[in-house]
Each structure stands twice: as C-alpha cells, then as structure tokens.
C-alpha cells in the first residue's frame, strides 16, 4: 500500500487567495558579494582606452572629407563639376548637399546672386564619404583594441607561467624531478 502524507499550505502561499504574489516559486535574494565590487576594480587600474586618440576635430574631418573626395574623383564616381545641374535635384533624383567652395567676399553673402553655387556632393556621395570615414575610424579603433588585448593577454600568460613555476618550486623544492611525481 502506498502511503502519502501531505501538508496543507498556509494562506500566504496560496496563489488564488493572494493575487499580488506570483504563483511561481520565489527566488532567493541575491547575496551581497563578500569580495570587492566590480566598480572597485575599475577604479584601481586606469582604462587602457583612455590613451586612445580623442575625437576627430573639425579640421581633421574636413581633411578626411577632402581626401575621400579626391579618391572618389580618381574612381570617377563624381560627375564633372562643369556639367550644369539643377540645384534642387541631382541626376539621381536626390537632393543635393551644398558646400561652399571657398570663403565669401566681405561685401557679399553666401546666397549672393552673383555666383550660382553648384552642389559639390549628392546625398548619396556624402553617404559614401561618411561610410568610408567611419569604416577607416572603426578599423583604427579595432587595431588599437587588438593591440591592447594582445598585450594584456601576454601579461596574463606571463603571470600564469610565473605563478605555476613558483607553485612547483614551493611544492617540490629542491627535489630532483622524476617521472613518478
């Protein structure tokens, strides 16, 4: 004969009578770590990424855009600047980005009717330039990150080898090495 014993649950555990409580099993509250918090470790050692070059300045961005423009001209992605275009629409049907080609004279404004400004880049071309610049910047960051990781890994490996050697020397001391031990 099978004998079974059951215990009646108290009201606080009954999910039907206590709608505020979840019918699922309660989880234990996480214990506070006895060791130092991760924030403490972050404060102890300066970040290796603090040494990374700062954000690009406006001059660097302008220089990079000019370099990319020259590359695109070499690849013949840009139309000839002498070809007349309607300033409101490009040949691709996209709006143009207006970039003044030089400084304006003190007596004239940027919207002066003396000179009809033609757009230098289409929206698509600006997108291509920005994409290329972002890719180059990402590649630089990846290279720096890989160098830092490789250095840190080499340091950890050296520390591990030294620790292992010290443990072996402490355990066996000056005993001659044997195949049995």
Swiss-Prot record:
Q: Where is this region: Disordered?
A: 18-48
Which segment of this protein is annotated as the motif SYVS motif? 178-181
Q: Where in the cell is it found?
A: Nucleus
Q: Which GO terms describe its molecular function?
A: protein-macromolecule adaptor activity; transcription coregulator activity
Tell me, which GO biological process terms does this entry list?
neurogenesis; positive regulation of innate immune response; positive regulation of transcription by RNA polymerase II; protein transport
Q: Which UniProt keywords apply?
A: Developmental protein, Nucleus, Protein transport, Repressor, Transcription, Transcription regulation, Transport
Top-level division of the source organism's lineage: Eukaryota
Summarize subunit and interaction data from the UniProt record for this chain: Homodimer. Interacts with actl6a/baf53a. Interacts with gmnn.
Q: What is this protein called?
A: Akirin-2
Which species is this record about? Xenopus laevis (African clawed frog)
Q: Name the gene behind this protein.
A: akirin2.S
């Amino acid at each position: 004969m099978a004998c079974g014993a059951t215990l009646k649950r108290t009201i606080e555990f009954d999910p039907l009578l206590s709608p505020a409580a979840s019918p699922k099993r309660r989880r234990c509250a996480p214990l506070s770590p006895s060791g130092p918090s991760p924030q403490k470790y972050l404060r102890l050692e300066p970040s290796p990424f603090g040494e990374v070059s700062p954000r690009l300045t406006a001059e660097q961005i302008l220089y990079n855009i000019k370099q990319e423009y020259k590359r695109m001209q070499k690849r013949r992605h840009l139309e000839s600047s002498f070809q007349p275009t309607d300033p409101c629409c490009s040949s691709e049907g996209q709006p143009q980005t207006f970039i003044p080609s030089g400084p304006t004279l003190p007596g004239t404004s940027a919207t002066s009717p003396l000179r009809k400004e033609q757009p230098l880049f289409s929206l698509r071309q600006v997108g291509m330039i920005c994409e290329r610049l972002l890719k180059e910047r990402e590649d630089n960051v990846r290279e720096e990150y890989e160098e830092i990781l490789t250095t840190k890994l080499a340091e950890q490996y050296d520390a591990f080898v030294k620790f292992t050697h010290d443990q072996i020397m402490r355990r066996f001391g000056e005993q001659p090495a044997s195949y049995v031990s």
